């Protein structure tokens, strides 16, 4: 039973870490990354469709993304979707390819982005601590139902804490890497 709780805890913490990585990968660093445009929805036959389903996005160089639209009739809709997104990008089309130059980040904008990254990191740590609390509650319930001894409860909580510490450390590493990425460019 305790092993199931530990496995579930680890799985949930891993999902929290992956969610954090996904969130902060969308934060623009000044370096062209195709994932930057992942959140963009294009109006396609009356419904919002993810850009990834309508076009191929590649990094042309360090400061330019190339969006190769599969259906030429959608070029203006894709261009409009990129322009109206909150990313502050100014696309230009050349044939079937839309080029999206990334403006350099100002020092002030970098500081703002670092604050956002730290906030996302704190949310990730909170999610991990909530998972720990749930696991500890499950362990206490086992003790209350007399399915485990107090020694087993203490040992299990210590193991859960070690898992938690490991994931909090991973969150810190992800944040440090993103901050370095924001400051280095």
From Swiss-Prot:
It is found in: Cytoplasm. GO terms for molecular function: ribosomal large subunit binding. The keyword Lipid biosynthesis does not apply. One of its GO terms (biological process) is cytoplasmic translational termination. Its main location: cytoplasm. InterPro entries: Ribosome_recyc_fac (IPR002661), Ribosome_recyc_fac_dom (IPR023584), RRF_sf (IPR036191). This is Ribosome-recycling factor. The gene is frr.
């Amino acid at each position: 039973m305790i092993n199931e709780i530990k496995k579930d805890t680890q799985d949930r913490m891993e999902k929290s870490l992956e969610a954090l990585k996904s969130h902060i990968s969308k934060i623009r660093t000044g370096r062209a990354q195709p994932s930057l445009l992942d959140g963009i929805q294009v109006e396609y036959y009356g419904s919002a469709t993810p850009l990834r389903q309508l076009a191929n996005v590649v990094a042309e160089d360090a400061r330019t993304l190339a969006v190769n639209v599969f259906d030429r009739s959608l070029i203006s809709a894709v261009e409009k979707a990129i322009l109206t997104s909150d990313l502050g990008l100014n696309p230009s089309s050349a044939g079937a390819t839309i080029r999206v130059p990334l403006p350099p980040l100002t020092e002030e904008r970098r500081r703002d982005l670092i604050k956002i990254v730290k906030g996302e990191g704190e949310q990730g740590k909170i999610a991990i601590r909530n998972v720990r609390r749930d696991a500890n509650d499950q362990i206490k319930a086992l003790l209350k139902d007399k399915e485990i001894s107090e020694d087993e409860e203490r040992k299990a909580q210590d193991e859960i804490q070690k898992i938690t510490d490991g994931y909090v450390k991973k969150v810190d590493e992800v944040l440090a890497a993103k901050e370095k990425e924001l400051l280095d460019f």
